[in-house]
């Protein structure tokens, strides 16, 4: 295939778009792969669409290889199935909701679990039909509050979602593993640098869950890796090692002190040190204090929020992403000034767990706050704190929650050293959903004994358009993009940088010869464009191989450069064979 730049629908830009912050967004717009249509919505231009379709092909091939069957559901979906699983409300404002002319409620699909479960229910009734895995490559819609980073975080995006249906938990585990391996093959073929991380299930529900994160300093997700083992997890899924329980009878006496101007942890520690207060014969540190964060938690469909107190060691900040993940599908927000006014027992800056217990406020604690541990905490009175406030004796908790920040150097689980932090972009997520959706849709199947059984379900998503952005993010340099051969819009970019008639004719003959070998060629035949502009465009567009008919052509040589490597001179008689050999290696 030959595409001539003289006729290609393309305009490259020399300046970065004003709204672009990350390299992939800047380069994909500048190189004419995508074009902004609205916030979070992009047009796929010819070069971008070719690349996207090639990413789709890699994904499709690996899905077909594990026996998954492709279908396509509509993007416009009715409300009723999402009511059955409560996700009409659980998704909150991120759903694009709309009405038809008769007042019927619809949504633009953010994900399609309901549709897959409903289809299996309608079409299958016997255990003999199982296992089955179905998938689609479909455009999805989510009303992102702040769409950003181009196609990395948009309101419209292309995604492959697949769903496995098995009659047993063992079958689900097998389907899950086959998808896990397929995703590894996809990312390996594309050359993505990635990490498989333990993850939370969130609104999806289910049990086991893992994310595939592409390593990137510009990623929105923070993940951890163990220094001495294979452990890796999204920071939202990191489980804090619990504190050591201590006998209550050995706990120190709880003593209340006046603590002037000690509204912050730092000020409280300074007071304790200046007052000569000690903990186990040492100076007080921030980790000896107990921080109490007041929040409001709203359950899906609830009209009113519930007030709750989050307890954590004073040397730790609250990680709102971890807190939000811990309460999903509920929503959480910080308590307001109005909440303090409406609850006089809440003394701002001095709230402690005793008042929360006394007034029936739910208390959720960090796993380090265990029975017998003693703390310096608010005494629920202005400029007063309690030293020696002991969990299990002086206050109780209603449950535990992962809300504290994770730090570099924290202990890794199972003795795998310590944790290191890095950032990444989520490109895939796999779940063992279990029976949440099949039960919601009453998917009943006759098993081998003739009894009714409910199949178990797995969900597996991979961001197709996001993968393209990730490749641009990970594979670029200061001059432009650098596509892997597997998904580059064209394999070879031929540039005629010599205006001699002989060079122009040789360029035509060269691209024809490459085409005869089945090579996809982008041919810069623009007659009125300078060599310098052609070279800059070739760098920006990022094809794997660039062939230049330039000054060396008068000596019978043609320049050949693999993107990111040094240029070599090849005899004009050997250039076709050389390119073919490099493509087939």
Swiss-Prot record:
GO terms for cellular component: cytosol. Homodimer. It comes from Corynebacterium diphtheriae (strain ATCC 700971 / NCTC 13129 / Biotype gravis). Belongs to the class-II aminoacyl-tRNA synthetase family. ProS type 1 subfamily. It catalyses: tRNA(Pro) + L-proline + ATP = L-prolyl-tRNA(Pro) + AMP + diphosphate. This is Proline--tRNA ligase. SUPFAM superfamilies: Class II aaRS ABD-related (SSF52954), Class II aaRS and biotin synthetases (SSF55681), YbaK/ProRS associated domain (SSF55826). Its main location: cytoplasm. One of its GO terms (molecular function) is ATP binding. Its EC number is 6.1.1.15. Keywords: Aminoacyl-tRNA synthetase, ATP-binding, Cytoplasm, Ligase, Nucleotide-binding, Protein biosynthesis. Catalyzes the attachment of proline to tRNA(Pro) in a two-step reaction: proline is first activated by ATP to form Pro-AMP and then transferred to the acceptor end of tRNA(Pro). As ProRS can inadvertently accommodate and process non-cognate amino acids such as alanine and cysteine, to avoid such errors it has two additional distinct editing activities against alanine. One activity is designated as 'pretransfer' editing and involves the tRNA(Pro)-independent hydrolysis of activated Ala-AMP. The gene is proS. The keyword Ribonucleoprotein does not apply. The keyword NAD does not apply. Consists of three domains: the N-terminal catalytic domain, the editing domain and the C-terminal anticodon-binding domain.
């Amino acid at each position: 295939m030959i595409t001539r730049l003289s006729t290609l629908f393309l305009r490259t830009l020399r300046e970065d778009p004003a709204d672009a912050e990350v390299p992939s967004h800047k380069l994909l717009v500048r190189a004419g792969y995508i074009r902004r249509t609205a916030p979070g919505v992009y047009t796929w231009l010819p070069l971008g669409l070719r690349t996207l379709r090639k990413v789709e092909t890699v994904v499709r091939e690996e899905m077909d290889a594990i026996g998954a069957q492709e279908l396509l559901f509509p993007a416009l979906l009715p409300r009723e199935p999402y009511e059955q699983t409560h996700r009409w409300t659980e998704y909150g404002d991120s759903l694009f909701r709309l009405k038809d002319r008769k007042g019927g409620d619809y949504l633009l699909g953010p994900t399609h679990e309901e549709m897959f479960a409903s289809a299996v229910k309608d079409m299958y009734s016997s255990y003999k039909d199982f296992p089955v895995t179905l998938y689609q490559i479909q455009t999805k819609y989510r009303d992102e509050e702040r769409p950003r980073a181009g196609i990395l975080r948009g309101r419209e995006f292309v995604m492959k979602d697949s769903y496995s249906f098995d009659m047993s938990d063992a079958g689900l585990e097998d389907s899950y593993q086959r998808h896990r391996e397929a995703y590894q093959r996809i990312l390996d073929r594309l050359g993505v640098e990635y990490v498989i991380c333990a993850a939370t299930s969130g609104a999806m529900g289910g049990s086991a869950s893992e994310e595939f994160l592409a390593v990137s300093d510009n990623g929105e997700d923070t993940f951890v890796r163990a220094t001495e083992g294979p452990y890796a997890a999204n920071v939202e899924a990191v489980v804090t090692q619990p504190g050591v329980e201590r006998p209550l009878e050995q706990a120190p006496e709880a003593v209340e002190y006046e603590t002037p101007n000690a509204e912050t942890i730092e000020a409280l520690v300074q007071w304790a040190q200046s007052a000569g207060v000690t903990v186990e014969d040492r100076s007080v540190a921030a980790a000896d204090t107990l921080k109490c964060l007041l929040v409001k938690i709203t359950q899906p469909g609830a009209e009113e929020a519930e007030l709750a107190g989050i307890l954590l060691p004073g040397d730790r900040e609250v990680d709102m992403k971890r807190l939000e993940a811990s309460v999903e599908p509920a929503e959480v927000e910080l308590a307001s000034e109005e909440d303090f006014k409406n609850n006089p027992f809440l003394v701002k800056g001095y709230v402690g767990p005793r008042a929360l217990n006394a007034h029936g406020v739910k208390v959720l604690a960090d796993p380090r706050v265990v029975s017998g541990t003693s703390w310096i905490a608010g005494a629920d009175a202005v400029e007063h704190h309690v030293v020696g406030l002991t969990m299990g004796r002086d206050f109780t908790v209603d449950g535990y929650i992962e809300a504290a920040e994770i730090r570099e150097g924290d202990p890794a689980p199972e003795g795998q050293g310590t944790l290191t932090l890095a950032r990444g972009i989520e490109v895939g997520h796999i779940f063992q959903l279990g029976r949440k959706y099949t039960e919601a849709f009453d998917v009943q199947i006759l098993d081998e004994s003739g009894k009714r059984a409910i199949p178990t379900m797995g969900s597996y998503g991979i961001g197709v358009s996001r993968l393209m952005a990730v490749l641009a993010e990970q594979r670029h340099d200061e001059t432009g993009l650098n596509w892997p051969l597997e998904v580059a819009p064209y394999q070879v970019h031929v540039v005629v940088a010599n205006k001699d008639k002989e060079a122009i004719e040789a360029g035509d003959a060269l691209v024809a010869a490459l085409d005869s070998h089945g090579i996809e060629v982008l041919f810069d035949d623009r007659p009125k464009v300078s060599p310098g502009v052609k070279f800059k465009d070739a760098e920006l567009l990022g094809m794997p191989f660039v062939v230049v008919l330039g000054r060396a052509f008068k000596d019978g040589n043609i320049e050949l450069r693999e993107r990111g490597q040094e240029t070599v001179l090849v005899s004009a008689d050997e250039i076709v064979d050389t390119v073919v050999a490099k493509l087939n290696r």
